[in-house]
Amino acid sequence: MNSNASNTPIAIGISQIFPCSYLDGQQEQLLVIQEETLDPILFDRLLAIGFRRSGSAIYKPRCPRCSACQPIRLPIKEFTPSKRQKRTLAHNRDLTWRITSEHTEAQYALYEKYIRERHFDGPMFPPSKSQYEQFLFCHWLPATFIEVYDGNRLLAVAVTDTLPNSLSAIYSYFDPDEERRSLGSLLILLQCRLAKLQDKEFLYLGYQIDANRKMSYKRLYRPYQILTPQGWEYSQVC
């Protein structure tokens, strides 16, 4: 693959086959890019063909017998919150939010609590600072943090990549004690708001996996587009 910006070839490798972390009984294999020459412009283009970031590595599923992972994005100029999403925004009007590039101990403490209480049965448990940094941070693209506060108390964080044409939602976490606030939904809505304020065309949400309940919520944000073999297509779901 060539970067249009520099015409420098980009090497794409393929991982070994290993058990899928999302679907029981399935096997996973990834196309992986780990290049020092990556930059936000090129990554924006890679997002548009289905790649995703984890740390400094860029990957895309290429599983031997499964195609359940569907790249999904929101066209920001067309996105309209549903009635339920509007209620979530209204219910959280007492909270404040801010954008920062600063990585803080409070962010990590909240992440640790979230993983210990919500994902103690998953591959990210037990949490550690080194795992957190390797998963979320990238040497060629500074992360953007959307922080949500109740007074001075940090309630939720969305880690987001800011790119020339889009935002990419990397990971979100929140205080499990505040489940009634639907903070996960609020963080997606705030990322949509930020994308609109920054005049971005898309918010990339990663992969939609219908067969995994924890990964199927992304279809609730409409209209959305799914990457198919024919290109990006709007959902037919009303």
UniProtKB/Swiss-Prot annotation:
Protein name as annotated: Aspartate/glutamate leucyltransferase
EC number: 2.3.2.29
GO biological processes: ubiquitin-dependent protein catabolic process via the N-end rule pathway
Alphabetically ordered keywords of this record: Acyltransferase, Cytoplasm, Transferase
One cellular component (GO) term of this entry: cytoplasm
InterPro entries per the UniProt record, alphabetical: Acyl_CoA_acyltransferase, Asp_Glu_LeuTrfase, N-end_Aminoacyl_Trfase, N-end_Aminoacyl_Trfase_C, N-end_Aminoacyl_Trfase_N
GO molecular function term, any single one: leucyl-tRNA--protein transferase activity
SS bond list: none
Matches recorded under PANTHER family: ARGININE-TRNA-PROTEIN TRANSFERASE 1, ARGINYL-TRNA--PROTEIN TRANSFERASE 1
Similarity remark: Belongs to the R-transferase family. Bpt subfamily.
